[in-house]
From Swiss-Prot:
Superkingdom of the organism of origin: Bacteria
GO molecular function annotation: (3R)-hydroxyacyl-[acyl-carrier-protein] dehydratase activity
GO cellular component, one term: cytoplasm
Keywords: Cytoplasm, Lipid A biosynthesis, Lipid biosynthesis, Lipid metabolism, Lyase
Organism lineage string: Bacteria, Pseudomonadati, Pseudomonadota, Alphaproteobacteria, Rhodobacterales
Family according to the record: Belongs to the thioester dehydratase family. FabZ subfamily.
Biological process (GO), any one: fatty acid biosynthetic process
Main location (coarse class): cytoplasm
Organism per entry: Ruegeria pomeroyi (strain ATCC 700808 / DSM 15171 / DSS-3)
Protein name in UniProt: 3-hydroxyacyl-[acyl-carrier-protein] dehydratase FabZ
Biological role: Involved in unsaturated fatty acids biosynthesis. Catalyzes the dehydration of short chain beta-hydroxyacyl-ACPs and long chain saturated and unsaturated beta-hydroxyacyl-ACPs.
Annotated catalysed reactions: a (3R)-hydroxyacyl-[ACP] = a (2E)-enoyl-[ACP] + H2O
Length: 157
């Protein structure tokens, strides 16, 4: 069996995730391998509202938004990998483990979110992921997180 590597532009991402500005934290997903792994991209800009208060004069992307960007990348991976596009897909955090922040992420950075599925199966509701966020090849953050997949039905048109 061959696995086709896919990608997702912002239009497809918005057909999968319910998040919108200012909380849509994935600009594109450049690699999706089924529902087992993916690589997302976040172009970090000064226009993001969290930089007004985190921190004035020294803008640093909050760690929680880095972890959320990894989780959103995992959500896109599940949407494409499990063919649940244009649905009422919601994914809820259940826990975050072994989270470490290693490098600041600042405006102008291009952050890559690498996620892989550790547990979960096609049609399942509980998944565990490992995520690593990098900037210029340096690890910025890493975490393991579990999520509950809630597919409540088709979106109305």
């Amino acid at each position: 069996m061959t696995t086709e590597t896919k990608s997702a532009d912002i239009q497809l991402i918005q057909r999968i995730l319910p998040h919108r500005y200012p909380f849509l934290l994935v600009d594109k997903v450049v690699e999706i391998d089924g529902y087992s792994s993916a690589v997302g991209i976040k172009n970090v800009t000064m226009n993001e509202p969290h930089f007004q208060g985190h921190f004035p004069g020294t803008p640093i992307m909050p760690g929680v938004t880095i972890v959320e960007a990894m989780a959103q990348t995992a959500g896109v991976m599940l949407g494409v990998g499990m063919d649940i596009i244009d649905s009422e897909l919601l994914i809820y955090f259940m826990n975050i483990d072994n989270c470490k922040f290693r490098r600041k992420v600042v405006p102008g950075d291009v952050m890559k979110m690498h996620v892989e599925t550790l547990r979960g199966k096609m049609g399942g509701k509980i998944f565990k992921f490992r995520g690593t966020a990098t900037v210029e090849g340096e690890v910025a953050a890493q975490a393991e997180f579990s999520a509950y997949v809630d597919l409540t039905g088709e979106k109305s048109t």
